[in-house]
Amino acid sequence: MSAPQLAIDYEAITELFHTAHAEGRNFLYEYEVYTLLSRSGAETPPRANLIPRGSRPSDEELMAIPGDKAVLKIVSPTIVHKTEVGGVRIVDREPDRIRSAWRRMLYEVPENYAAWIERYPDAAPAEYRGLSGEVLADAISRDLKGVLQVQFMPPDSSAFGNELIVGLRRTREFGMVLSAGLGGTDTELYAERFRKGQAIVAASTELTDGETFFSLFRQTISYRKLAGLTRGQRRIVTDEQLIECFESFIRMANHYSPANPDAPFIIEELEINPFAFTDFLMVPLDGMCRFSLPEQLAVPRPVHRIDALLHPKTIGLIGVSASRENFGRTILRNILAEGFAPENVVIIREGEDFIDGVACVPSLRDLPAHMNGSVDLFVVAVSARQVPDLVDEIIDLNAAASVMLIPGGMGETEESRTRAEQVIARINAVHATEHGGPVFLGANCMGVVSRPGKYDTWFIPEEKLPKERGGNYRRAALVSQSGAFMLHRISQCPELRPAYMISMGNQTDLTLGDMLRYFTHSDAVDVIAVYAEGFNDQDGLEFCRAVREAVLAGKEVLFYKAGRTPEGKSATSGHTASLAGDFMVCDSCVRQAGAIVARTFTQFQDLFLLAETLHDKTIRGNRLAAVSGAGFEAVGMADSIHSDDYAMRLAGYAPATREALQALLREKRLDALVGIANPMDINPAADDETHARVAASMLQDPNVDAVLVGLDPLSPAMHTLAQTATPAYALDDPQGIAPR
């Protein structure tokens, strides 16, 4: 389909915002939302007329809107859910009936709303907090602007699923997000109870267009109902109408976006709930819009200095003890153990000449001559209380290209937020200068292991986590907001050998988006795995842009987001000072950008290992052949080829493959026990050679794209023990499966 030809009158929409702002409002009334829609290219906003409180409309005015019935809606700056308080009435289109209902609403709605607030005081608008009884009802009554008379347009169907919600929302992390799905008063229930992506879908407006979003929307129950694809249902809207609607909302979102430096206003929220459908017309039945003034864009960080952070030629440290094993001393020893030249390391330590063979100087002003007054990387391992003054000194002396802030106590708690804000303000100020100053990793950062940079600043002793030192690493990076998460992945799965392991900590300066963009352009990395707890303002959007760029460049991006539940969000806030956003939005945006999103820690770990080891393999398709010596596992393989996130097919064998497998089974005397199937259960009696030859036959089949082999480690016929005195069970035996 070609892009919709839309005529959006941005000047008229901006004037609506100007008028509301001049009246001290940050929202549009419902009738103003209908005006906005009419200026956005929408075909059928209903006719509406505001009956101001205290006015005396004539019969002619009340009858000016056509139809058999009239819809009356209360208009108030504080009442959002009008139906619950009797704020919506449908009456016969007769002047007296309209007057009666209108007058009744002006008295009944304040009473109903006051009663509702007294039942749910925590949900009360700020204007009504602490009020009750007649005082509360009077305050609500004073805020009523009047009643809106709206054209009644009966829907084609009132069946479940025949109403559509379309909304824009400005999110802190991902900017403007468009969502659409099952509309009506039970929208929240649908989103909560239906499977992911069935009730509501969402996308970043900067990373999609009308047609792309429509492709996503087609997967929902809402589309199947609207398009007449369910039993007893007929189509009530065209695909072209939906695409045009989505495209209009996307363009408005990107115009009134915090990412647009020329935006006159920012749309905080624009929602139509619901659109109903009458004779192939999309009719908005309710709408709301909130807006704000534009804000100053964040100062860009000198992210090119990440290269100095990851590949430093010189390193400085502060916080190294000469007499005991503290974090700083452990970091020093790990740096040297990874192979970094000690003559290119300097310690800030007054009263000492050398610690572990590394030179000490009394202050940052005394850096060795060959360092020219500045190091590529400066590691801060002192207490959080010392950090603000130290950051000032580093910046004033231009003493480092990059800084690693190890200490916590920099924003994780209320008590430490003032200290963190002080440091952030100082860093942002230097970033605004021509030089830009250093970049800062952390705070609350476990450090970095950079195999190409030949250094390790993790504060974990070698005795606790022995590492395979040297150049045996893969073209992968693990970026984690939690150092402990990264530590446990490497401890549980030592087969993981990424070139870089980076603990981001609190993102005081450098962000997840910055780091992903760096590795997107890195020639040393093909696989990027990210554990996130929360994004800085707008950084989720930057992250997704970098994900898309990386994937289009042929790289794999793996992602796990913590803080999926209210309890999880609370836990992450206390961990690394992250602000957990809405998981559904995060999941949608990151997936649509092209990342592989893991559901569990174990799945993340497994996917990372697969991506590390198989990235350079060519996978032609999703036709799978599987073999196992355990029957339950073969069944489990068949049960696991589909999920909400992926779909594979069990391959059909070519005749030559069937013949080869049958001949092998006869040779191994398994033909009476094993049949040719996919997945193939070859019985615990199958030895290592049988497993290997079955897999080889499957791999040669032109109908097979990948082979999955399950090994039964307890089978007496298999070599599966790493340490044993019995050669028949030894993993490294030449006849075993491992050497094959």
Language-model segments: residues:
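Catalytic-core regions of core metabolic enzymes
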Residues: M1-R740
